[in-house]
Amino acid sequence: MVLNAPAPLVPAETETIKIKAVGDLVMGTNYPDNRLPADPRKSLFSDVEPTLRGADLLFANFESTLTDYPTSSKNINRPLIFAFRTPPSYAKILKDVGFDILSIANNHSLDFHQQGFDDTAKNISSAGMRFTGKKGAITYMTVKGITIAWIGFSHMKAAHNNVNEISEGVALVKEAKKKAQLVFISVHGGAEGGPALHVKNEQERFYGEYRGNLVALSHALIDAGADLFIGHGPHLPRALELYRGRLIAYSLGNFLGYRVFSTKGYGGYSLVLEVDLDKNGNFVKGKIHPLQLSQNGIPSPDPENKTTELMQSLTKADFPGKGPKIQNDGTILP
């Protein structure tokens, strides 16, 4: 009698949470003049909407305001001073495209005073999304039965958790970890432009502002229990690092800046970062989906993979032996 041999055991695939994240997002402004697109959802997102789909969570840094407040807190007559105001109705577009949570901790969220900041938070919530970035606040959400906490930081001390106050950030992460299984960090920090391409383990300054030591901050927050660190603010992509099994993305660059961002040089290199984490927060795998920005700041897929090549180079240069493996097709492995 011949007995059938038992089928070999196949290891179950690790259940993961998939996050997709993009950097700085401005859909246009109607202040001080009208720089808004016609048919905004189609004109701004049609080329990248398929790439944004398919995640359990979709995140962006919303670097504008959603308000009708008439006067700005900034003197835009001074050189290199900009104020962004986007119609509140545009919040629904972001929801329809698929965004789940937006950071409002950045240097434009107070462009229209506290009222504009409060309006932005209210309009994001009314559209069915969540936000992170209020000082002292932790945003909780549940995905696949797992409680996730988000904490947003910037260099703006008054309204946001500050990148330079590391001990306060550590305390927030420890507080979040009491209720959440995973803690995700969004940070608007670091200097801007070409000279800021490389990550350095030192305080970064930009026009006299202290923009944080992002290496020290990310490591301290992960030591305290954070599981993912998403950076934005330098307006160009930066290196990736793996620290204690957690992924650090030091900058995702510009994602969308309709007629408001410079897209010259690395300012036009963009991406959608895809990250898979296990239920304990360990980095499992990821992918760089490279994008390019048009002269008007509209994203589309980049067939030349320039962003992937740039981030490969930066990761090897800035974190030799400490970065994840970035393959030529954009796949990221521990």
Regions found by a protein language model. Name each.
Residues V2-P334:
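Acidic, metal/ion-coordinating pockets
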